Amino acid sequence: MPELVVPTTRVHRSWLQAVAEPEYDPRWADDLDLDRLTDPTEFATFVAGQRAQATEDAPRPTGWVPSTYLWYVDGATFLGRLSIRHRLTQWLHDYGGHIGYDVRPSARRHGHATEMLRQALPWCRKLRIDPVLVTCDLDNVASRKVIERAGGKFDDEREGKLRYWVPAS
């Protein structure tokens, strides 16, 4: 059964396949040298860096906040990723929310995003984030349904972003 886990090297091959899929938009990977990450040692360093982002003192770009990065995996298969931002900047409050997630294209339309968000809520409780702000694009009907299935209550729309508050408890 698929589960949210901290980033792990055991899905190296599948992760590389996922980011190479047509229609996958890994904006979160824009600054990554994907060719370099084919090397297991380099990938292990990347994984360690992902894990470290949950700490307050980890190096990160200006304006970024500590975040717990989780990968949704089934055995050695990478299905998607989810990030929990530990606090909100003004931009995150207005547009980005506490949680961001995506599912690799070949795994979409199987309920994975719904399950990912459901499994993320206990992590949010441990981080004392309750309620959880989750946003989606105005035209992203699938994501809107995911958020509403998780109990999200619509707050408002800001410049094309729908904002929902999801109870973590």
Name every feature range the model reports, one short phrase each.
Residues 101-110, 139:
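Active-site acidic-Proline motif in GNAT/NAT acetyltransferases
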Residues 107, 111-119:
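Conserved acetyl-CoA pyrophosphate-binding loop and the N-cap/start of the following alpha-helix
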Residues 1-98, 102-105, 155-169:
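GNAT-family acyltransferases
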